[in-house]
Amino acid sequence: MNNPDLKTILSSWQGTPVDKHGRFMNHEFPGTQTFGNALKWTFEKNPQKQTKKNDTWHMQVVKDDNFLHTEEDVVVLLGHSTFFIRLDGKQLVIDPVFGDLSMHTRYTDFPIETAKLVNIDYVLISHSHYDHCDKASLKIIQSQNPDAVFLAGLGMKDLLSQWVGTNEVQQAGWYQQYKLDDGLEIYFLPARHSSRRFINDTNKRLWGAFVLKSKKKTIYYGGDSGYGSHYREAGELFPGIDVALIGVGAYSPRWFMLPNHQDPQQAVQAFNDIRATMMIPFHYGTFDMADEPLSEPEDILSKAAEGNKVKHQIRIVKPGEAVILD
């Protein structure tokens, strides 16, 4: 399945796979976690419970919105999986989540006033899970940016259109390029994940990763993903990626999380597969969404980076900290 109105960049690709029920599938690792497995995890004992209780670590936040008032190419983690990016003067927000979620308290303040997120050209939504696709945050973005274009995966338009009014929504299949007319190129690529917002919509909306390509810079945003060959494929399709944004948290217990979230060691391997110049980790420290302590992803990532001799290429940033792309 794909969007016939969009260009497919991989000539051999036959379209995003679906099962007999019309549900999207991971092409390398078909299948998804069952509701029974989710219940099992919910009620089983967390072996790291006491360690989590004793963990006093909190991510520091940089409350400086100066990056909003410059013209430089920049990447800014705003917490969890939310990014502000500027490339060639075009401003983008990825997976905006500004506050608490219905089942998760936010542990880090949002680093800027949301009212200042104006002049946004594109809003990218990697998938439909609540910690990436937040109704309240999207309504704020839309109200302040009536001309912003929303870019997402197949099946997302019906959901987003309820919240973003008459703003344009484009939905893509994997290996498809969105229709933009300003010189910026944005592509939707595979990720190893799943989607669900309600009991009856499992994998009805496509998940994925993004590649953003300007005249001078290329950025990869991995969304939520387990480890797989799609990282190597992204590096081959887009050689010379400058920055890879890769999730490193919500990976424990492995028996349950492995298909959907890589652990920090696998994130380093993914970075090596992509062959990017720099990695910025995300998806940790803001919400408590798994068994591991909030501090653990960063600790393990640092050790894995040292062991893989990529310590100086992995940039651990604070929410609100601007990374200027020279």
Annotate each predicted stretch with a short phrase.
Residues P96-F110, S194-D201, S252-H261, D288:
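Acidic/histidine-rich helix-loop elements
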Residues G99-L101, T105, F110-Y178, P190-S195:
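Active-site HxH/HxHxD metal-binding segment of metal-dependent hydrolases
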Residues D95, I125, Y187, I246, ...:
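Redox-cofactor binding/interface segments in oxidoreductases and associated redox assembly factors
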Residues N3-P4, S12-W13, D19, F24-H27, ...:
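Cap/insert and terminal regions of metallo-dependent hydrolase folds
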Residues F84-R86, K179-D242, L258, Q262-Q265:
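Catalytic core of the metallo-beta-lactamase
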Residues L77, F150, Q171-Q177, W207-F210, ...:
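Tryptophan-centric aromatic hotspots in well-structured domains and transmembrane helices
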Residues M1-S102, E113-K116, G153-Y221, D242-G249, I300-E321, L325, ...:
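Metallo-beta-lactamase
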